[in-house]
Amino acid sequence: MSCLFCGSFGPMSREHVLPKWFGPLFPDFREVDYVRAFQRTGDERINHLRPGMAFDQTVRHFCLECNNGWMSRLEEQAKPALESLVLDEERSISAVEQLTIATWMTKTILTLGPAMLEEGREFVTEETYRWFGEHRMPLPGSICWLGRYTGGEEWPISFHFHGIQFYPEDQERPQVVGSTHGFHAVLAIGNLALCLFCCSIPEG
């Protein structure tokens, strides 16, 4: 297995898909069975229960060098602003912090893909992972939104991920999802809502 971000076959790490420091921000959220749901267009929804804390979820798709290097530095850079926003604390966000949060959002959603989706890599190409690993900034053709979340649900986190496929309006919608042209993801943590839209429109 090679690292999704750099392609290295070096030692792989157990990367936490969400930072461990999120856990203490939710002291009332104890170990429970959390739900992963999968659904393709027209298919029946499939739910999977996973025991344990969602903040303890790890994946082995990234190498030690990436995980302990630039990925760790990005977490530290984003932490001050993220912590305030997750806890619904009033604060301003500088232009630099906005870029940092957008980059962190992209990294986290790409990391969540293999962990939360049975076929996560189908919706995000290898080239997309490599581009982000090299440039470490929001993806080309992407839009990042940040907002205050007031869902009031019992879960401190919620993640939704959808592949996007374009087709000419004079053709029927494809019945089988093959390669996609992009994705849309929404991640809510505490009172923070993050939305990422990324696509490339095919020619013809």
What residue ranges belong to the model's regions?
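Short, surface-exposed, charged/polar-biased interaction segments
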Residues: P24-P27, V35, Q39, E83-L87, ...
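Surface-exposed beta-strand edges and their flanking turn/coil or helix-capping segments
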Residues: P27-R30, G120, S200-P202
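Short N-terminal signal/transit or membrane-insertion segments
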Residues: M1-F5, L18, L25, G113-F132
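C-terminal, charged low-complexity interaction regions
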Residues: V124-G204
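An N-terminal structural lobe/cap that precedes and organizes the functional/catalytic core
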Residues: M1-R73
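Catalytic cores of phosphodiester-bond-cleaving enzymes
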Residues: N47-E119
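Short, well-structured alpha-helical interface segments that form or flank functional binding sites
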Residues: M12, T58, T100, G182, ...
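Short loop/turn segments at secondary-structure transitions that flank enzyme active sites
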Residues: F9, G69, T111, A193, ...
